[in-house]
């Protein structure tokens, strides 16, 4: 479309210049038309330039996936730079970010409450910290809340108000993260729901208006439907309250895993195979980013079998480990080989 636009514009200019000159009254031969060499050259240059630009773009589109693969194979996953536009300026975020980072960032920047759900150790807390840094806001954190005062604060015996992380974020502005919201008592959601809906809240020290920069992100291991076999002690969250949150599923990110492993694809291949074998064996066990980090740190200190035992198995019952080993694929991987060999002893 861009090329055709250039050609059409050039053709409009070319047409009036292409008229032949008048013929003399008594020539022995008809006069030759004046050749518009300059316009022709201009048109050809426009066409050539357009085609060249399209060719470069086409080549780059084709080559980009291969270039990225070459870089990843030889140097590992490189940090990315993401530009964040706020109301006042533009900031750059450089580093390893989860593939859902930009989505969550846009939601938080737009003052939309977010609920991140995903397995333990998949980076939900890290996403929130990176978002607060990207937006230039303070980060406030609270784990599962089972008592209301841990959100609202309280007046102590000396008559002094004891502030909470939620109170500070609500009054001074910042990103407040409530981790394990599905492990918090349902009364907590009622409080958050009221604060989000009204933009004010009645704390023990009186009514407080929400700061314009107050943002909230919650996280959990379930979708708020209650406890399951893997995650016990979880509450069913109130549907009307949860409806105020944009729900984002956060899974393990392959690029982050590869970065943690220092580009060691054999480690990541083993971790992915181990997770799949856990599911196939119907065993409840978590292998998070932390397992990869331990595996990389310990592999130079111990032999492979001891490293697997300390970094991944971590006291797992031998029967469970055998069930998982039976479901591991038959591929050339030293970690899979050593695990199976260890369990045969």
Can you annotate each of these PLM segments?
Residues 3-345:
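C-terminal regulatory/interaction module of P-loop NTP-utilizing enzymes
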């Amino acid at each position: 479309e861009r090329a055709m636009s250039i050609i059409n514009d050039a053709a409009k200019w070319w047409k009036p210049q292409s008229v032949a000159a008048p013929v003399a009254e008594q020539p022995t031969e008809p006069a030759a038309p004046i050749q518009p060499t300059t316009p022709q050259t201009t048109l050809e240059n426009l066409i050539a330039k357009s085609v060249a630009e399209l060719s470069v773009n086409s080549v780059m589109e084709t080559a980009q996936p291969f270039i990225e693969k070459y870089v990843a194979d030889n140097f590992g996953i490189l940090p990315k730079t993401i530009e964040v536009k706020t109301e006042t300026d533009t900031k750059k975020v450089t580093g390893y970010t989860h593939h859902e980072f930009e989505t969550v960032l846009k939601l938080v920047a737009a003052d939309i409450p977010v609920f991140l759900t995903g397995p333990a150790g998949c980076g939900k807390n890290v996403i929130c910290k990176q978002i607060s840094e990207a937006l230039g806001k303070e980060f406030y954190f609270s784990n599962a809340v089972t008592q209301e005062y841990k959100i609202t604060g309280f007046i102590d015996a000396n008559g002094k108000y004891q502030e909470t992380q939620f109170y500070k974020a609500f009054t001074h502005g910042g990103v407040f993260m409530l981790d394990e919201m599905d492990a918090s008592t349902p009364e907590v959601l009622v409080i958050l729901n009221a604060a989000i809906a009204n933009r004010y809240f009645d704390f023990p020290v009186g009514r407080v208006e929400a700061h314009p920069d107050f943002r909230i992100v919650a996280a959990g291991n379930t979708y708020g439907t209650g406890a399951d076999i893997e995650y016990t002690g979880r509450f069913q969250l109130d549907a009307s309250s949860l409806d105020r949150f944009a729900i984002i599923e956060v899974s393990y990110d392959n690029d982050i895993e590869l970065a943690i492993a220092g580009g060691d694809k054999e480690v990541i291949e083993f971790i992915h195979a181990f997770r799949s074998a856990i599911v196939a064996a119907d065993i409840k066990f978590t292998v998070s980013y932390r397992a990869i980090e331990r595996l990389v740190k310990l592999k130079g200190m111990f032999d492979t079998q001891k490293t697997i035992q300390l970094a991944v198995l971590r006291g797992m019952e031998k029967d469970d480990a055998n069930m998982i080993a039976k479901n591991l694929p038959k591929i050339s991987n030293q970690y899979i080989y050593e695990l199976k060999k260890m369990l045969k002893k």
